[in-house]
């Protein structure tokens, strides 16, 4: 069973304002990076940026065949 840890974060400069988000997906056993990405979102709120990062990371976990996911975020 593939277990992974998802770290996600997003933010905006202003609320709303220019925003971005990113995530890293790590194999929980080895610490190997399974996926890593970030992007500019355009104008968005800080909440949209945070949740976008989380959802994007979870989609990548599903695509990587992760069966158990531990998500970690600062919000």
Feature map (PLM): residue ranges:
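RNase H-like nuclease fold core
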Residues: 1-48, 52, 56-69
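Short, intrinsically disordered, charge-balanced linker/junction segments flanking boundaries
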Residues: 70-75
